[in-house]
Amino acid sequence: VTLLFAHAYLACPPLRQDPLLATVFSLLVVFGVCCWIYASFLQRFVFKGQRMVVTGVRSLASKTVEITMEPSDDKPLHKGRPGQYVALSAPGVVNGPHPFTEVSAPGRDVMQVAIKVSGIDTRVLREKVGVGMEVKVRGPYGDLDLRRATPRQVWIAAGIGITPFVAWLRAIDELINEKIRRSGVSSSKIRKVASQEVIDQLGLDTVDMWFFHHGEPAYAEELYYWEDRFSWLEVHIRDTTESERQSAAEIIAETPGLDIDHLDGVSAVICGPKTMMRRYSRDLRSLGVHPIIREDFSFR
């Protein structure tokens, strides 16, 4: 963009002759150059975060790994809500911090994030990440809170956008386990009671999870595991290398128990590429689905 502004300034004499336009374009070019210098060279020194060390690397798919990290000092681990993400920087490996969703269950003294190759920096990080690597983590950020949804929910994820939902499912299981531990008794009956208490606490009734991947079924086995474990969850996984992603209307039509003409009380939670989220948000809203919750990776 900076080069385009510079080219327009040099190639268009009227811009140089008009004092106001010349000043505006000059400031834009200088601002762009400063942003590039900061992102390419200075950000790695300015970026502040908790120092951590990689203690585990697990391959999820050909382009996706899950890394486990622990604090490299005595400072307590900064844990966020399920579904939030952190900004991770690997000095000497990538130029600056990148957002990755935290997928570790609450109550653990480790942090886990999933990394999928989506550009040069993530490719380098995917190839070089290993046990013992030092990283910096800042955050958590984000406001993807499923508690804002209605009891009848439709979850839609694409690609690495599955990670916030994995985090929530792990968190729900940990909440159930915590109630069982507090009871002092472990049995299938106690687990059923604890599960119902957690579901009532979260305001959940029925959830249909739609996961679209492009030949990268990261966490697919785990999703089926949660489907078997949670009676309120039904999982639908589609490979977009074999067929196109369903439209919003098709998702509603193929979701058991939903009537496209009567969607009162149905909410949707969406995470994935921005264009996908915008399209599904628009189309689901036009069908009467409300509220629609999505993660826009906002730093708040």
Q: PLM features: residue spans?
A:
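Conserved beta-strand elements of the Class I
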Residues: 152-156, 267-269
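A short, basic/flexible loop-to-alpha-helix module at the beginning of a structural domain
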Residues: 139-149
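Short, conserved phosphate/pyrophosphate- and ester-handling motifs at nucleotide-, phospho-/glycolipid
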Residues: 83, 161, 273
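Ferredoxin-reductase
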Residues: 44-137, 152-154, 176-184, 192-194, ...
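Reductase modules of NAD(P)H-dependent flavoproteins
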Residues: 1-12, 30-33, 96, 120-122, ...
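Transmembrane alpha-helices and immediately adjacent membrane-cytoplasm interface residues
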Residues: 8-10, 20-44
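Short, well-ordered alpha-helices that flank and scaffold nucleotide-derived cofactor binding pockets
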Residues: 167-178, 278, 282, 286
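A phosphate-binding catalytic loop at a beta-strand-loop-alpha-helix junction
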Residues: 154-168
